[in-house]
Curated annotation (Swiss-Prot):
Taxonomic superkingdom: Bacteria
Compositionally biased tracts (Basic and acidic residues): 1-17, 33-47
UniProt protein name: Exoenzymes regulatory protein AepH
Region (Disordered): 1-47
Purpose: Involved in the control of extracellular enzymes production. Stimulates PEL, PEH, CEL, and PRT production.
Organism of provenance: Pectobacterium carotovorum subsp. carotovorum
C-alpha cells in the first residue's frame, strides 16, 4: 500500500465537512419529526 499523507489528510478534512453537513441536516430532520409527533399527540388528545 502506497502511503499518501496529503491525499489522506484532504480526504479526512472533506469527510469531516460532509459529516458536519449531514449532522446538521439530521438534527433539523429530527427536530421537525419531533414537532410532528407532538402536534399529532396533542391532536389525538383534543379528539
Amino acid at each position: 500500500m502506497g502511503q499518501e499523507p496529503k491525499g489522506i489528510e484532504s480526504r479526512k478534512i472533506q469527510d469531516g465537512h460532509v459529516r458536519k453537513k449531514v449532522g446538521r441536516q439530521q438534527g433539523l430532520w429530527v427536530r421537525t419529526t419531533k414537532k410532528e409527533k407532538f402536534s399529532r399527540m396533542s391532536r389525538d388528545a383534543n379528539v
